[in-house]
UniProtKB/Swiss-Prot annotation:
Protein name: Carnitine O-palmitoyltransferase 2, mitochondrial
UniProt xrefs under InterPro entries: Carn_acyl_trans, Carn_acyl_trans_N, CAT-like_dom_sf, Cho/carn_acyl_trans, Cho/carn_acyl_trans_2
Subcellular location: Mitochondrion inner membrane
Gene Ontology molecular function: acyltransferase activity; carnitine O-octanoyltransferase activity; carnitine O-palmitoyltransferase activity
Transit peptide: 1-25
PTM sites of type N6-acetyllysine: K239, K305, K510, K544
Catalytic activity: (R)-carnitine + hexadecanoyl-CoA = O-hexadecanoyl-(R)-carnitine + CoA; octanoyl-CoA + (R)-carnitine = O-octanoyl-(R)-carnitine + CoA; decanoyl-CoA + (R)-carnitine = O-decanoyl-(R)-carnitine + CoA; dodecanoyl-CoA + (R)-carnitine = O-dodecanoyl-R-carnitine + CoA
Amino acid sequence: MMPRLLFRAWPRCPSLVLGAPSRPLSAVSGPDDYLQHSIVPTMHYQDSLPRLPIPKLEDTMKRYLNAQKPLLDDSQFRRTEALCKNFETGVGKELHAHLLAQDKQNKHTSYISGPWFDMYLTARDSIVLNFNPFMAFNPDPKSEYNDQLTRATNLTVSAVRFLKTLQAGLLEPEVFHLNPSKSDTDAFKRLIRFVPPSLSWYGAYLVNAYPLDMSQYFRLFNSTRIPRPNRDELFTDTKARHLLVLRKGHFYVFDVLDQDGNIVNPLEIQAHLKYILSDSSPVPEFPVAYLTSENRDVWAELRQKLIFDGNEETLKKVDSAVFCLCLDDFPMKDLIHLSHTMLHGDGTNRWFDKSFNLIVAEDGTAAVHFEHSWGDGVAVLRFFNEVFRDSTQTPAITPQSQPAATNSSASVETLSFNLSGALKAGITAAKEKFDTTVKTLSIDSIQFQRGGKEFLKKKQLSPDAVAQLAFQMAFLRQYGQTVATYESCSTAAFKHGRTETIRPASIFTKRCSEAFVRDPSKHSVGELQHMMAECSKYHGQLTKEAAMGQGFDRHLYALRYLATARGLNLPELYLDPAYQQMNHNILSTSTLNSPAVSLGGFAPVVPDGFGIAYAVHDDWIGCNVSSYSGRNAREFLHCVQKCLEDIFDALEGKAIKT
């Protein structure tokens, strides 16, 4: 049996906040072109990864109904139950059989991979706020290294070293170790590298090590989402050697790899970035970057206008760049300012379509903002961790380093766009939409300092289950109801796995929340503790099922996708208001833990929802929440704080304060 993996990914537009490392990071090499020199090739396990299972239809129906119970009244539930029975014995049975047959014919991938790419790429909403999340780096532990030029140079060099290490197959394979004393050793690595790739996964399995899918990694670099009518496309050009830099809405490119594929001298990179930082040009009257925040069909049409007006070569340089480095010209005021800056900014200094934007503010605060269609949080977090560690432990330059004496004006190309009247009007319209939308977004955060993972584990409770219970209690306290809740879980243990949904709202969390919020005096502390234990046990079961590909959301989505692809009328199950309500995720939650991350976040996935990024640390709990004007994030966090206080009081044997 495979392990209970607790890797979280991002929801439709996922999240994160600081926590403990999910895996030991691999050994670091010296300051050369490579981060690591793994003796096991990076993709050694990829061919032998197990395939993502398709759940039994009857199991999916049971799990779906269990998730609906806390959201529906008796009459609504009976209707949904009847629709499920009809679906299971009728059209659902036929679709499931077709899905199984299709899966057998496509053993190179997973049943969800194609539909999931389509889900992202056919979405016409702006990718800003609706999809793209961010994660912010912790400051460099050595304060003098947080100078903007120093940090931008070191992060850039480390990112390119990651690229080189990945391309050379020298990056340690991503492996989840249940018994690292046996599997995460030089002796095991020397042995497993001689096992053929077609069998290597089984060799790791024998020592309780579980390699994870790494198919998304090749889209990290040189990649851009290109807007097209109806369906966007992902573009990658692995031959490109240049970096794209944005500052004050201006575009610059220069090579970070030479003609032989070696990393350009870090002092030259430092010189080029210093040259860009010294450019005193004002923000353009019509910043082209706003276009990447538009509706995708609108942007596709405007992009064609850009090409028609002679900007094709300029766009190619933008699209093929190794990545986009954004140099902001202001410091961070506080965590709220940081979240707004890294999640959306002012729209002038991000190319939202790039696989990722590496953002460095004037005070050295840095973050990764990434486009979501190409990959999930697991791949980005690995890159994030390695770059943070490399840039802080083996920095390419020091604060005392002198930039190379090179002619940056010849090496750095400033890109310019020819803009017709129609394009200028398009940029103006995009700016107005962008400004209007981001003004409606509120973000706030709390740090609950009374305890965290260590205390909860002593009480034999799942830390994640307790955090999710607090969100259920808080929403009940604020709005008096239980609503559809989404927690993302990675299925990277399988070939081309993406994510599965954990549904944290259950009959157990509803009962427990009502006891705490509505009538705590009617229950003894022992009864409250027992209810929390039930919640924890059930949440653990849901988490295990999701990580093993045994949720219900992706299966039902794939069946719906197949029905549409076959030209069938949408089965009645999908027209049920209960189904639509469940997929209107008012509470969208995600957690990714890393010692490199200071904060992360994402916007709500529905207008009346919350985007909840959180982490349970050893001795505190962090939560970063976003909302639009229809909800109140600050008030919600006050309720979360109160609910966590109540939970900890009950666990300590104290009466709940009303």
